Amino acid sequence: MGNFLYFSAETWTLLVAFITLLLVYAYWPYGTFKRLGIPGPKPVPFFGTMLAYRKGFFNFDDECRKKYGKTWGIYDGRQPVLCITDPATIKAVLVKECYSLFTNRRNFRLNGPLYDAVSIAEDDQWKRIRSVLSPSFTSGRLKEMFDIMKHHSANLIQSMKKKVDKDEPLEMKEYFGPYSMDVVTSTAFSVDIDSLNNPSDPFVTNIKKMLKFDFLNPLFLAVAFFPFLGPILEKFEFSLFPSSVMDFFFAALRKIKANHENNKQKSRIDFLQLMIDSQKNNQNGLQDKGLSDHEILSQAMIFIFAGYETTSSSLTFLAYNLATNPEVMKKLQKEIDATFPNKAPVQYVPLMEMEYLDCVVNESLRLYPIAARLERVAKATVEVNGLVIPKDMVVMVPTWPLHRDPELWPEPEKFKPERFSKENKDTFDPYTYMPFGAGPRNCIGMRFALVMMKLAVVEILQTYDFSVCKETEVPFEMDVQGFLAPKRPIQLKLTPRSASSS
């Protein structure tokens, strides 16, 4: 203690200067929204408002919407984030000014080998990659893939039957996860891993490791507190994603890509083959058109990641909603029986024309949106509907509170598919319902995910009823870490329709 008191004048000066600079650094960004006249929760040094994420970012967003109205400001570490729920402003950001001012999503860096994935890439690179991928998701292409999907949905039903025969509850994610994985790998790479019958398949175990993301991860916090560290850590190949998982998937995808390139007799065109063809069509020197080897691997990886998690989670929530709303399930089964009498094989066109099925899926996605937050970054300072948005500001649309706003959706907590009927569709603004995002940068796999979901639920309901059991948590508690998911697995029973009908 004595040594501390007898520091030299120069040491004291440096110490005071350091503390002053640290305090300035800690507090400097937190006047942004006050200067703009935008309300919001009070930030704390370095963390900003991130400590509130401990209650779940969706709960935090909901609290802010109720307290501050349609517009508010939060801080992810030192990064100001402008939150908007006004439909006109949302349309301007996501659609009207997408290409000119709000092209890019927020980039946390530390993406490892996924730096050039379509969901992360920016500006011209993103446009080029998106244009190459888009043909993979047309209605015509999905129709070609439908029989492959049906092969795996049949496996799903057969796998579920084993539990039904034992009169045991089913942990829904343990079935919908492998189903999603099998469909994605089959339609994307012509590879059949059959994870439904091989739950310990490394594709499944590794994807689960990747999904264990914590917003209070020390590496994530370091970049949030000190953004200048991002490029430095990236140079040293630090990543928010487990390196062992990335190494596994990229090694596997390299082998699959090599097999595609060496296979002279291509039985079918898949997602990977379309990307490889973009390279071959590009050999005339127009290097700005096709994808590089690394870009191909990154898109394949992000397709596995997004296809597995979003579809399996959405199917799990949908099954829960049907089990807890049996009158909706019975009405849906009537439509299924009318469309495919006597358990007739499900066909693509009539499936996609089922109106009540569409309402049911939309309502489930309203309650549990795939994309709970949509983000864009302003390229320049701009005024949108009277709201000044400074350059480099992150603009965020919180879909969870938007989808559950009682002013927009009467009785928002209730599962009411009729909200999306033809008669009611004109009663709400399309920019108040965005489970897959909106505009040019929406989810590219939206139609693919919807086909997978509709096929699975229709084939299950042709034979079974979803029902709650003693293991079912009603209502279930949401997990507050990472992605939108229940805290504990959702368990339901499947009851043969003949038994339940009688």
From Swiss-Prot:
EC number(s): the record gives 1.14.14.1
Which catalysed reactions does the entry list for this protein? an organic molecule + reduced [NADPH--hemoprotein reductase] + O2 = an alcohol + oxidized [NADPH--hemoprotein reductase] + H2O + H(+)
Q: Where is it located?
A: Endoplasmic reticulum membrane; Microsome membrane
UniProt KW keywords: Endoplasmic reticulum, Heme, Iron, Membrane, Metal-binding, Microsome, Monooxygenase, Oxidoreductase
- Its primary localisation, in coarse terms, equals endoplasmic reticulum
Disulfide partners: none
Name the InterPro entries on file: Cyt_P450 (IPR001128), Cyt_P450_CS (IPR017972), Cyt_P450_E_CYP3A (IPR008072), Cyt_P450_E_grp-II (IPR002402), Cyt_P450_sf (IPR036396), Cytochrome_P450_3A (IPR050705)
Topological category with respect to the lipid bilayer? Peripheral membrane protein
Q: Which cofactor does it need?
A: heme
Q: Under the cellular component aspect of Gene Ontology, which terms does the record hold?
A: endoplasmic reticulum membrane
For whether the record's keyword set contains DNA-binding, the answer is no
Give one GO molecular function term: oxidoreductase activity, acting on paired donors, with incorporation or reduction of molecular oxygen, reduced flavin or flavoprotein as one donor, and incorporation of one atom of oxygen
User: For heme, which residues are the binding ones?
Assistant: C443
Q: Which family does it belong to?
A: Belongs to the cytochrome P450 family.
Under which name does UniProt file this protein? Answer: Cytochrome P450 3A40
Tell me what organism the protein belongs to: Oryzias latipes (Japanese rice fish)
